């Protein structure tokens, strides 16, 4: 499906291509190659409904002033089959199109007919995309970085699905390596402490209170039998039990946050299956692995990285990077056209070597897209809430959802671009005022539901779309709402192409603002029946789009507040 705005953009682009070709044929513009014509919706109201910078794009290759090119384009422009009322040249050579006010009324039947599918696109054309996100070590609870990644990854996956991609959500379980060994040692100490032994937890151990609870749970179920086991068996047994408990807890926490994964993928399985060795052998055969100082190195410098990277340590144990290469190789083996990873910004140094390793294995490095997230700071009463995973003092995702609610948490985590540092104001997220963007947006939906409910209580049916005359919606507040509703499919396309859920968050806030402004200055039910019926259908359209957009971010659309 294509939205009203995209249809108009497409028809204007075709008309402009014909116009510039005509201008070249007449000698009004020097011969040149015609680029793709980009049509945009101007940010400023006074700059028209649509605009293009085509004349400025052509100025250099044509060796002409952009305004002169713009004049030639307009002279050759056939707008007979468009709804363009007038065309103006602005600034250095922008071409601004002003449409007949009635153009935007066409969005009303489109929204009513498509309903839950309004905004859905075929942009992805069924391409398979994997989104891997959170993938936290299963050795503790989920912190704010994990929470931001969960909201971002799940929202992005929903947007891509809505845009026509076949999406798989995946969690990579880091259940191998040094952190698991350290986890086993920490569990052993806590186990022995619980059974009366005077033993200290090393400084580098896991100090969170949660592992004490895990050990108590193990003792309640299995007793003291591990006291008689050897150290290796004791640590492995406790680690296996704790990992299962932690993973179950993580799954349930994410489920409560509205995140459901299609695949949970074990790092240990890569070791057990021989996939890591197989991948390293392939890289060696291709000439990208060499031995130095009794270790094996990947030639990351061959792919633009500053230094090569160890993949097998001198003790013969593969590094985390080696497992990561094998894991990503398997993603492509499973048939994904694109792979999207969401990482913390502290992993930025890992990006180029990861892409390089995929290129070394024969894949297009650009098909691996990595989104880096900046840090989250929690604020309460204007003061920073300190977080420390090692000391067990950080605020967990569970605690956050309990304090502010799932909807507020999810919206706040995606309302800024992931490359921006995020200050999460707990007081604002809990407030029931228009300053809280979540309250502001959801209240718009609830307000509309209240209007429609009152109509039903009065025994009046919602007007049929065929029975209304949308052209009576002439007020600027009404036209602004209609233009914003018409923009929704374009916003979906932009959010999908730019991997930017924050665009949908911003769109929601803007749409809610336009609705509240309209509602505060206009009565929906008036003495004029034609206007009343048109406005009732208009607010129903706003309700549909609010609900659709809220759903993409994993938020509810309440009918009462």
Curated annotation (Swiss-Prot):
Protein biosynthesis keyword on record: yes
SMART domains: Arg_tRNA_synt_N, DALR_1
One Gene Ontology term, aspect cellular component: cytoplasm
GO molecular-function term, one example from the UniProt record: arginine-tRNA ligase activity
Keyword Nucleotide-binding: yes
Chemical reaction(s) catalysed: tRNA(Arg) + L-arginine + ATP = L-arginyl-tRNA(Arg) + AMP + diphosphate
Subunit and interaction comment: Monomer.
NCBIfam families referenced in this protein's UniProt entry, alphabetically: argS
PANTHER family: ARGININE--TRNA LIGASE, CYTOPLASMIC, ARGINYL-TRNA SYNTHETASE
Official protein name in the record: Arginine--tRNA ligase
């Amino acid at each position: 499906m294509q939205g009203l705005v995209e249809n108009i953009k497409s028809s204007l682009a075709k008309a402009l291509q014909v116009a510039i070709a005509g201008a070249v044929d007449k000698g009004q513009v020097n011969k040149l190659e015609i680029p793709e014509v980009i049509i945009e919706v101007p940010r400023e109201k006074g700059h028209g409904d649509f605009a293009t910078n085509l004349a400025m794009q052509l100025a250099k290759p044509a060796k002409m002033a952009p305004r002169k090119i713009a004049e030639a384009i307009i002279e050759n422009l056939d707008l007979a089959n468009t709804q363009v009322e007038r065309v103006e040249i602005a600034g250095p050579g922008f071409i601004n199109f002003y449409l007949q006010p009635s153009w935007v009324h066409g969005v009303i039947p489109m929204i009513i007919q498509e309903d839950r599918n309004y905004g859905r696109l075929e942009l992805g054309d069924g391409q398979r995309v994997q989104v891997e996100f959170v993938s936290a070590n299963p050795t503790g609870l989920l912190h704010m970085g994990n929470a931001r990644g969960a909201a971002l990854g799940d929202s992005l996956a929903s947007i891509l699905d809505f845009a026509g991609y076949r999406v798989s959500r995946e969690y990579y379980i880091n259940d191998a390596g040094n952190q698991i060994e350290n986890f086993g040692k920490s569990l052993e100490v806590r186990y022995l402490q619980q059974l009366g032994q005077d033993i200290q937890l090393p400084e580098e151990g896991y100090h969170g209170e949660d592992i004490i609870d895990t050990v108590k749970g193990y003792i309640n179920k299995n007793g003291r039998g591990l006291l008689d086991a050897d150290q290796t068996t004791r640590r492995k047994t406790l680690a296996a039990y704790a990992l299962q408990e932690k993973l179950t807890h993580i799954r349930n926490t994410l489920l409560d946050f509205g995140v459901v994964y299609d695949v949970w993928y074990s790092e240990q399985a890569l070791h057990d299956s021989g996939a890591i060795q197989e991948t390293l052998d392939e890289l060696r055969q291709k000439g990208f692995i060499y031995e130095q100082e009794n270790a094996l190195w990947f030639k990351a410098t061959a792919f633009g990285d500053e230094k090569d990277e160890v993949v097998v340590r001198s003790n013969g144990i593969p590094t985390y990077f080696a497992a990561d290469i094998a894991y990503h190789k398997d993603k492509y083996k499973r048939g994904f056209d694109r792979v999207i990873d969401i990482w913390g910004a502290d992993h930025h140094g890992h990006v180029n070597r990861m892409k390089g390793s995929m290129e070394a294995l024969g894949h297009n490095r650009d098909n691996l897209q990595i989104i880096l997230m900046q840090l989250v700071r929690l604020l309460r009463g204007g003061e920073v809430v300190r977080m420390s995973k090692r000391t067990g003092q950080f605020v967990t995702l569970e605690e956050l959802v309990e304090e502010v609610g799932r909807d507020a948490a999810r919206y706040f985590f995606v309302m800024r671009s992931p490359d921006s540092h995020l200050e999460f104001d707990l007081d604002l997220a809990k407030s029931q005022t228009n300053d809280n963007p979540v309250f502001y947006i959801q209240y718009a939906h609830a307000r509309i539901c209240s209007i429609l409910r009152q109509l039903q209580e009065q025994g009046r049916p919602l007007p049929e779309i065929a029975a209304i005359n949308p052209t009576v919606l002439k007020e600027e507040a009404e036209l602004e709402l209609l233009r914003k509703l018409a923009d929704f499919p374009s916003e979906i396309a932009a959010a999908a192409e730019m991997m930017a859920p924050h665009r949908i968050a911003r769109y929601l806030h803007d749409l809610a603002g336009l609705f509240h402004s309209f509602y505060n200055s206009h009565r929906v039910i008036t003495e004029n029946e034609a206007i009343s019926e048109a406005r009732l259908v208009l607010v129903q359209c706003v309700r549909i789009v609010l609900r659709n957009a809220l759903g993409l971010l994993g938020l509810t659309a309440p009918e009462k507040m």
